A protein has these predicted regions:
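N-terminal hydrophobic/helix-forming segments and targeting peptides
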Residues: 1-355
Length: 355
């Protein structure tokens, strides 16, 4: 397996792409794959579809990963110049007070802070309560007149942090959900190209608006109409204190890709993913999904007449916080798994269960 391209990964993670504002990351993807893909098209939603044409008649495979990240949106500017905000996606209000944030405007990006009364001024009974998001404000440290000049209602805000390596082989950043996936599925295309291509088409679908309802994955799967749809997304690591593994499963950072199994997953796709991992000598983990998953796989499976669908993940600690943590070696291990899965397909494979 190759080393992680940390420069590319860092650029993805630190480029803002709050749901509905994914254009800058889409530009990075188009630039990255410009000399690799045979075709690149962007649909009206903003999802980028990069296609590597196959050499034969094997099933076409679309792998999706969403470009959007959670964040905040400006809803009101007070006469004093403070910003009120709403969540875009699943933001935990409990982690926001005292945080540095970046406000993205037409004229540039401005650092702000989420205000918090000092503990000395908080009543004892108030200290134990989470301040609702609608009661939090962002301070830009500017006169109100300037704030109202540069900030517009609807401007988006990201956590004011970026990519760092730490510990042994680990990394921390905002937005590994799901820019880790964007990294992986673009790298899969590069690896397939280097290998001379597959027998069927590979479509790298970097999608939009997953965090508010799987909207990009839905429209991409319908529009492209591939034979096989695989979603890549992060899943919850359960290897830190406070997580009940008997309830949530045992999933460890650094123990390899996670392959989902359940009614949302085509059984042939599942078995072939496991077989590919074994062929490549890649350690992998299994995750039980007894219901429809909350990933693009949930939407892609029921497009048109139904799609042979899979879900591959890596274990991630502290999802939807500014300090999401992954093991870097899991990235390229997943690239190798997905590459092997695609290369193993031929025109005789059937994804109809039991046939």
């Amino acid at each position: 397996m190759k080393k992680v391209d940390k420069t590319y990964l860092k650029s993805l993670l630190e480029t803002p792409s709050v749901t509905g504002s994914e254009v800058k990351v889409a530009n990075l993807v188009r630039e990255r794959l410009a000399d690799t893909a045979d075709e690149i098209e962007t649909n009206v939603m903003g999802s980028v579809h990069s296609r590597l044409k196959g050499k034969g008649n094997a099933p076409s495979v679309m792998i999706s990963a969403h470009m959007d990240e959670i964040g905040l949106m400006v809803t009101y500017i007070s006469d004093s110049g403070y910003l009120s905000v709403a969540a875009v996606g699943g933001v935990d209000a409990a982690i926001l007070p005292g945080m540095r944030v970046d406000v993205h405007t037409e004229s540039g990006t401005y650092r702000g802070v989420v205000g918090r009364k000092p503990i000395h001024l908080i009543e004892p009974d108030e200290r134990k309560k989470v301040t609702p998001l609608e009661n939090l404000v962002i301070d830009l440290g500017m006169p109100a007149k300037k704030v109202k000049k540069i900030v517009r209602i609807g401007d988006v805000i990201t956590f004011g942090v970026g990519f760092e390596k730490f510990g042994k082989g680990m990394a921390v950043s905002r937005a590994f959900d799901d820019k880790a996936g964007v990294y992986i599925i673009t790298r899969v295309m590069e690896e397939l190209k280097e290998a001379g291509g597959a027998q069927g088409d590979y479509i790298c679908a970097t999608t939009v608006q997953e965090e508010i309802g799987l909207r990009g994955g839905t429209t991409s799967a319908y529009g492209i109409n591939p034979d096989v749809c695989i979603a890549f997304d992060v899943t919850h690591a359960t290897d830190y204190p406070g997580i009940d593994q008997s309830k949530h499963g045992k999933l460890l950072c650094g123990d390899g890709p996670v392959i989902a199994r359940g009614p949302n997953i085509n059984p042939v796709v599942f078995e072939r993913l496991c077989k590919a991992a074994k062929e490549e000598g890649i350690p992998f983990q299994l995750e039980a999904e007894p219901r429809v998953t909350g990933t693009d796989a949930g939407a892609m499976q029921i497009q048109r007449g139904g799609k042979a669908t899979g879900l591959v993940s890596i274990a991630l600690r502290y999802m939807h916080t500014p300090t999401e943590v992954i093991c870097l070696q899991d990235l390229e291990a997943t690239v190798a798994l997905l590459k092997r899965f695609i290369l193993d397909l031929d025109e005789d494979v059937s994804f109809v269960p039991g046939v």
